[in-house]
Amino acid sequence: MWVGLGGGVGSLGRWWIGRIVGEYHHGAFPLGTFLINISGAFVIGYLSVLFGVDWHDRYGTMLNAGVLTGILGGYTTFSSMQLDAVKLSHKGQGGLAVFYLVASVLSGLFAAWLGAMLAHLQG
């Protein structure tokens, strides 16, 4: 139940932020999805350390399941990132599509690491 409720909250947050970014950014780069995924990676890195979560127990408690799997799972979007890249490729912007995918993965890894390091420093 908590995962479903959290997923709804996260999805609404993704929609809201994507809409706001879309009102101000009109370029070809899918900035909304990029910012959503990077911020989600930062938050999950931070909270996983704060909650003391490892890979095997991240689905365990209601708090972990509701926040990490539910909210952040609904908020971030791997499938939209892939669709954005396909759309760019179909528009003849294959180079931008590759840049977007590489930048998303590397920035996401860095953001998750940074979130985890910040949580370690505070704890």
From Swiss-Prot:
One of its GO biological process terms is: cellular detoxification of fluoride
Q: Does the keyword Acetylation apply?
A: no
Regulation of this protein's activity per its record: Na(+) is not transported, but it plays an essential structural role and its presence is essential for fluoride channel function.
Q: Which Pfam families does this entry report, sorted A to Z?
A: CRCB
Q: Which domain of life is it from?
A: Bacteria
Quote the catalytic activity from the record. Answer: fluoride(in) = fluoride(out)
Topology versus the membrane, per the UniProt entry?
Answer: Multi-pass membrane protein
Where does it primarily localize?
A: membrane
Query: What one GO molecular function would you report for this record?
Result: metal ion binding
The record lists Na(+) as bound by G73, T76
Annotated keywords: Cell inner membrane, Cell membrane, Ion channel, Ion transport, Membrane, Metal-binding, Sodium, Transmembrane, Transmembrane helix, Transport
Q: Which InterPro entries match?
A: FluC
Kindly list the cysteine pairs connected by disulfide bridges.
Answer: none
- Give TM regions: 33-53, 59-79, 98-118
Record function comment: Fluoride-specific ion channel. Important for reducing fluoride concentration in the cell, thus reducing its toxicity.
Name of the protein described by the UniProt record: Fluoride-specific ion channel FluC 1
- Which species? Brucella melitensis biotype 1 (strain ATCC 23456 / CCUG 17765 / NCTC 10094 / 16M)
